[in-house]
Amino acid sequence: MSAFQRLRQIALAIILTWGWKRALVAITAGALSVLALAPFNLFPVLFITFPVLVWLIDGAGAGRYRGIPAAALTGYWFGLGYFVPGLYWIGYAFFVDADVFAWLTPFAVLGLPAYLSIFTAIGFALARLLWTKNATRVLALAASLTIAEWLRGHALTGFPWNAFGYALSEPLPLAQTASLIGLWGMTFLTVAIFASPATLIDRTPDRRVAWRAPAAAVALLIAMSIFGAIRLSLHPTTMVAGAKLRLMQPNLQQDAKFNYAAKTEVMKKYLALSDRASGPQSTGVRDATILIWPESAFPFFLTREADAMAEIAELLPKGTVLITGSVRAPDLPRGTPITRAYNSIYVIDHDGSVLAVYDKLHLVPFGEFLPYQDLMEKLGFEQLTRVRGGFIAGTVRHALPMPGAPSALPLICYEAIFPGEVAGRNERPGWIVNLTNDGWFGISTGPYQHLEQARMRAIELGLPLVRSANTGISAVIDPVGRTVASLGLGVEGILDASLPAAIPPTIYARVGDVPAAVLVALAVLLAVRRRVAKRHP
């Protein structure tokens, strides 16, 4: 039996399977697909798993449940297989305060994937609606899953974590296509490219026809690699003159970050670590013009603690500013009970004055606020941060002015996973500053995934990314995605680096998701045309 005959035999077995066996195949395909993401980045595995999706939808008309419902159910099983191992690390957050939250772990580890799988079910159902018996069905699947992923990134508050397009974030030349079409365009190409081998089993008068889609996919990968290599060569890393960064990674335990009694020890550690010499020629914090501390750095309201502000002023040499995360109290008269707060970024001058403030816009559901907050609190529920009343969302994203350096686009924590989070068309910043606290997720795949997704924002926009993380991974990344310097996960230390310079705005920075929308629209139109032609030859 030839290799082609074996492939056809496997495909037919998948097409004809139903019941629990079909669910098992879909779940397995989803679980294996996670290997394409950070930290594994084994994207060739999708050449195996995505053709299986095509064959499963091919067989959605067989068995007890037929057509669109069968495709939707298959998509749901695939989603569970993909999201449970891809997001298992969420469970770590519930053990930070285990006495209160540990019992919720199985509900979170299974509940969030169960919700997100609704979107893969929608994608499969839409694909089946557009399905054909030729290679066009691959484009139908690519368009449908891209629409579903876009919905996942926007519905309610949105959660586009581990979107399929991130499978092409490594190697770096392939990721450069994101500068043209963004994450959703990369999602379309990911599905179209890796699902294409499914057509090898198609019965055609000319066997060469069955090879057209896989050949086109390989050609596209080669073209993307060439484009990426050229783009990387055209944009070597250059630095902003006079802008010297120092990132402080304290590797602080989560319980200390929310324990007011530990404020003295926390502040002492930050000050000592920030002024630590990084080498024989280092003079500590005097080496830097911009010192950066991570998200929600303190177990107190920073600007309401005069001693802490004075210590920061004493630490900073003249000409050096501090960018730090901190909870921020609303502007209320002193003595007024504080029931809610902002998750904020401060820019603080060497004399202890606040130069700029940004309040986080995209809050984490159940982490920073509860849906139906008042009702949920009455029922005894609270968010992981245990801030009564929940955090307040900011109102506008604006660039932070930076003395001696270009202005910075602020992103706090998972705001970096949302493509298109740009300050404004007329306010292009010089770099992205991302403060985060991935200590919630321990030593797991979560922080690696988070970094990879933040790096995609740099490539999309042509802006360098500077990322300060409590427990790692802190990094300085240039505007085409090269890592200039980094500190690993679970490491305490400081990172000294120059600030990479931005490059001219990318096509994606100029037009946003228009190219991705065009790709999806063309694929849908082609699929509809093929279906109409089949019914009315």
From Swiss-Prot:
PROSITE patterns: CN_HYDROLASE. One of its GO terms (molecular function) is N-acyltransferase activity. The chain crosses the membrane at residues 10-30, 37-57, 76-96, 107-127, 181-201, 210-230, 507-527. Keywords: Acyltransferase, Cell inner membrane, Cell membrane, Membrane, Transferase, Transmembrane, Transmembrane helix. It is found in: Cell inner membrane. Pathway: Protein modification; lipoprotein biosynthesis (N-acyl transfer). It is a multi-pass membrane protein. It comes from the Bacteria. Its EC number is 2.3.1.269. GO terms for biological process: lipoprotein biosynthetic process. The active site is at E295, K360, C413. Its main location: membrane. GO terms for cellular component: plasma membrane. It is an enzyme of class 2 (transferase). Pfam families: CN_hydrolase, LNT_N. Residues 248-501 form the CN hydrolase domain. InterPro entries: Apolipo_AcylTrfase, C-N_Hydrolase, C-N_Hydrolase_sf, LNT_N. Catalyzes the phospholipid dependent N-acylation of the N-terminal cysteine of apolipoprotein, the last step in lipoprotein maturation. Belongs to the CN hydrolase family. Apolipoprotein N-acyltransferase subfamily. This is Apolipoprotein N-acyltransferase. It comes from Bradyrhizobium diazoefficiens (strain JCM 10833 / BCRC 13528 / IAM 13628 / NBRC 14792 / USDA 110). The gene is lnt.
